[in-house]
């Protein structure tokens, strides 16, 4: 029925409905369809102008797709490409003249090398101005290097052209104070130079020549005086003392060294050998050298006192040449008494050697058998040796003589050892008290009493 009603609707109503629809469509032109059209028409926003030229502008167009949904405008579509001028097109080699071409037309300004060598010392060695004028043309290459770098950079001519010319202008302003050594102006340039280098050459030469000569002349005589005064000192202290102390000593060393030579000729050779170190330490001042040399005279008597002192030391060391006379004087009484006391004892073998003494003890083959014999080394510190037998072994124990206390002791020096007034007291003590026997090979200790006296046949 609804369909029939719709069909039967009068034509006037249908017209009205159509008019309303058309009117609504016209009013909705700014609606969705209009927005869709704008989206299709609009491109990405314009890009700010770049300071460099693109190699292939077509490549940039390919980067933006048609479906790009943002509000970014494409600069190729909206911007006037014809009005935009690329810097590469404008800065052509034909229209732009590099700065070195302008400077080559000008006169070469040699102010740059003269700023370096403006000092008088450098000018004095090279008086002639022509060599400087020959070397000056090498400097124009300096601005040309910067011009090459400037040409590679993509910058407008308005920025580059004002940068290049002010540099030579500044140089010309600085050069106004100086005279350029051109061939035409050589005469005007040489006159002030001739007056200035002459005093500059004389001043250093005079000062440098006089200072070392004056110091060497004044210092050399004291060195020779010191060498003549002491013969031994020349070989030891002359070499290190020559470079540094002599210029420091100066004029003061001349007078004190002259006063000391006469007495030092006799004994300086012996004394200077003992004390070279203080002389080297105080070689800087003349007064310290006097203090070193002045006490040298009294010690000349000290070596006389020290000479007899080492003699008994050599005798104590056991030198055979000194043992003969020296121990005989203090020990005549003691050794004579010992020999008299030991001569009648049954256990004293006298000047028996070690082998025969050991054989005699092995023949006895009794633990505690013993004898006393003279030491084979004939040492004043070890005059006798105690030979004991225990556990089928023979022990040779040295009997030491202590000079300070005139006493005897057994074995090597050790803490808490016993001292005896004679060899007989040693035998009597160990006949009642055990004697410690140390085997150095097996590192063992045994003890026994001296029981059986053995005679060597």
From Swiss-Prot:
Source species of the chain: Rattus norvegicus (Rat)
Q: Where is the composition biased (Basic and acidic residues)?
A: 272-290
Q: What is its main location?
A: cytoplasm
UniProt xrefs under Pfam families = SH2
Stated name of the protein: B-cell linker protein
Q: Which residues carry this modification: Phosphotyrosine?
A: 72, 84, 96, 178, 189
List cellular component terms (GO).
Answer: cytoplasm; cytosol; membrane; plasma membrane
Q: Where is this gene product found?
A: Cytoplasm; Cell membrane
